[in-house]
Regions:
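Generic protein-terminus/edge-of-domain signal
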Residues: 1-67
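Conserved metal-binding segment of the jelly-roll/cupin
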Residues: 68-82, 99-102
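Short hydrophobic/aromatic patch on the recognition helix
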Residues: 71, 229, 278-279, 283
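A hydrophobic/aromatic-rich effector-binding and dimerization subdomain
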Residues: 87-153
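An amphipathic alpha-helical interaction segment
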Residues: 136-199
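A short, Lys/Arg-enriched amphipathic alpha-helix from helix-turn-helix/homeodomain DNA-binding modules
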Residues: 162, 184-222, 243-262
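Terminal helix-turn-helix DNA-binding modules in bacterial transcription factors
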Residues: 235-274, 296-299
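…primarily DNA-binding HTH/wHTH and HhH modules…
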Residues: 280-299
Length: 299
């Protein structure tokens, strides 16, 4: 498999798509008016957001494939591999693209909080599907950025462009919250699977051999990206995925402590702790009592 093609700058994107560069660090493109692109895998040094206006080909993102549907928003952060199955074909995308270099937001409020927009780390099959009304809001944000790009660059340009990008991202947070709500029944099934996964893990020897399962491990077992999985669990339970796993471990630990034939050290090793003192400290942080104190209070 060939190495992915690197996209190094906004100017490169504009040149390859046959568009004029109005600002070296940011661009909004009408895909239907741009040159076709080669079907290949890409890795980008810039942030890329795509709004699709109609159904198009199958997109490959990481290890997964996704049938890119109409009214879909896809967010790609620098360093992520995306694209199509490799071929010599040229395709004509439709919809819109927003591209901005990290240097545009460096030192700004958005630059400091960009990592909080966790959907940049979602898998492509977890893309955002928007309604017609939401699409109009997205295009309004894009058009405000386009207006600033058409305006001669002055001391206000960067502030106004970045603030409109941030507003668009904040709207996207709202739209994702709506999508989480409308897919609640699907997410309940994920939580049921998560609970079953933890039960099986804790009942096996994995806990003693491998230690506590990580959020990434659980997400992979459920065919979700860690960020999407974490956001899903947080919205459905009010707890982070890590907190949920730890609470499950505490439940198992409490059951073990009830068995007075087992020492605290035995329980600690069985639960995957290398040192009993680490287990005692962890248990006390979570419960407010040491394992021995908890055992005495119940007996």
């Amino acid at each position: 498999m060939a190495n992915p093609l690197r996209i190094e700058s906004v100017t490169q994107i504009n040149n390859e798509r046959g568009q004029k560069t109005l600002h070296p660090l940011v661009s909004v493109l009408d895909q239907s008016l741009s040159k076709p692109v080669k079907e290949a895998r890409y890795i980008s040094d810039v942030y890329m957001i795509f709004l699709k206006d109609e159904k198009c080909g199958e997109v490959k993102y990481g290890r997964n494939h996704y049938d890119y549907e109409e009214g879909t928003l896809l967010f790609i952060a620098p360093g992520q591999v995306f694209g199509f199955e490799e071929s010599e074909n040229m395709i004509q995308p439709t919809g819109w693209g927003l591209f901005f270099h990290p240097d545009l937001i460096r030192g700004t409020h958005l630059g400091k909080c960009i990592n909080e927009y966790s959907f940049f780390s979602y898998d492509v099959n977890e893309a955002l599907h928007i309604s017609d009304a939401e699409r109009e809001i997205v295009l309004e944000c894009f058009n405000k950025i386009r207006y600033e790009l058409a305006h001669p660059i002055d001391k206000h340009s960067r502030t106004l462009i970045v603030s409109n990008i941030e507003m668009f991202l904040n709207y996207s947070v709202r739209f994702y919250d709506r999508q989480f709500l409308t897919r609640e029944h699907i997410h309940k099934d994920v939580l049921t699977g998560f609970e079953g996964l933890l039960n099986n893990y804790f009942q096996s020897e994995k806990l003693q051999i491998l230690g506590l399962p990580s959020v990434s491990y659980c997400a992979a077992q459920l065919n979700l990206s860690p960020k999407y999985f974490g956001d899903l669990v947080k919205k459905e339970t009010g707890k982070s995925a890590q907190e949920y796993i730890q609470l499950k471990l505490i439940d198992v630990a409490k059951e073990q402590i009830l068995d007075i034939s087992k020492s605290v050290s035995e329980i600690a090793y069985k639960l995957g702790f290398k040192y009993p003192s680490h287990f005692t400290r962890f248990f006390k942080q979570q419960v407010g009592h040491s394992p021995n104190e908890y055992r005495k209070s119940l007996n």
